[in-house]
Design a protein with these regions (language model features):
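Thiol-/selenol-based redox modules, centered on thioredoxin-like
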Residues: 22-25, 145-146, 151-185
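Bacterial Sec-dependent N-terminal signal peptides
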Residues: 1-24, 69, 175-182, 204
């Protein structure tokens, strides 16, 4: 009987101890060194390619996420961080007012990118190239534990410093949108054909030439062309991402034997692709994309429909 009582007491103690650990505020132990709420955040370079600095993002909420792929706790929190990034990040959805800056302490960018190839993070990504103890970002923001997260308000002050992703989630759910600066540069401005969408449609109508062979065979296609618009608005790196052939009713191609039909369809698919690339390549310069007012190079996808 005594042994049974001892076992029950020990079991009860174990449950109680476990509950205390699970309910512990980890910020007390691990976030004490982070910049406290109300502190004006120091400036830092966010994107070297467009010389974007943290101070350029004033007027918007910003999340600094300090992490590394070698960190077990970071990997544990990554699914929730992905959800927050997808839900709130300004690059994911127009109208979102939070910019995520993911600062990695991996040894090199390749290692970080290998990990992120399986984890979708839409915001800015910085790789420090070494452990956080030896970095300027850790010194500036007081990072002594990862993952760490700092939510910055539109006035450039710390709204929350934490090592707990659940606290960040709650803070993002209750953002004070009245603090946003309506005059601040937009987080994302996509590239635009000069004159806008109507001008682009008119350009395509006037300049796309239907391939003669495809017309004779009664073939149509919807081609999706991807290309890069650089900071000068110039187009490069054209790629055909989709080329869906279809035939009109009683199309002449249907009268060909299977071998000829296959060869002709392949030939016409190439003609559609080449014409789509030709008309895109011949476009005048676009209005370049901007991120927080800075011109930036981005990829763009354009569908071109060939229909009889």
């Amino acid at each position: 009987m005594n042994k049974t009582i001892t076992f029950i007491l020990a079991f009860f103690f174990a449950i109680t101890a476990s509950a205390q650990v699970s309910n512990e505020d980890l910020d007390v132990k691990y976030a004490a060194s982070l910049l406290p709420a109300g502190t004006e955040v120091p400036d830092m370079l966010v994107d070297t390619t467009i010389n974007l600095r943290l101070s350029d993002m004033r007027g918007h909420y910003v999340v600094l996420h300090f992490w590394a792929s070698w960190c077990p706790d970071c990997r544990k929190d990554m699914p929730e961080m992905e959800k927050l990034d997808k839900r709130y990040d300004c690059f994911e959805k127009k109208g979102n007012e939070v910019a995520f800056v993911h600062i990695s302490y991996d040894g090199d960018t390749a290692r970080m990118n290998r990990y992120l190839s399986e984890h979708a993070l839409n915001g800015y990504r910085l790789c420090q190239g070494r452990k956080f103890h030896d970095t300027e970002t850790a010194r500036l923001f007081g990072v002594k534990w990862i993952p760490s997260m700092i939510l910055i308000d539109p006035q450039g002050r710390v709204a929350l410093s934490t090592v707990m992703v659940d606290k960040l989630k709650k803070a993002l759910q209750h953002l004070d949108l009245s603090k946003l600066d309506p005059n601040a540069p937009k987080a994302v401005e996509m590239p635009e054909f000069q004159g806008g969408t109507d001008a682009l449609m008119n350009y395509l109508v006037q300049n796309v030439h239907y391939p003669t062979k495809a017309m004779e065979m009664g073939l149509q296609s919807k081609v999706r062309v991807s290309f890069v618009v650089d900071t000068l608005g110039q187009i490069s790196d054209l790629k055909i991402k989709e080329n869906n052939l279809s035939a009109v009713r009683k199309a002449p191609i249907s009268k060909l034997n299977p071998e000829e039909r296959q060869r002709t369809a392949k030939e016409c698919a190439t003609l559609f692709a080449n014409e789509a690339k030709r008309v895109v390549r011949s476009m005048p310069a676009w209005k370049p994309a901007r991120s927080f007012g800075k011109k930036t190079k981005v990829s763009f996808m354009l569908p071109i429909t060939f229909r009889l």
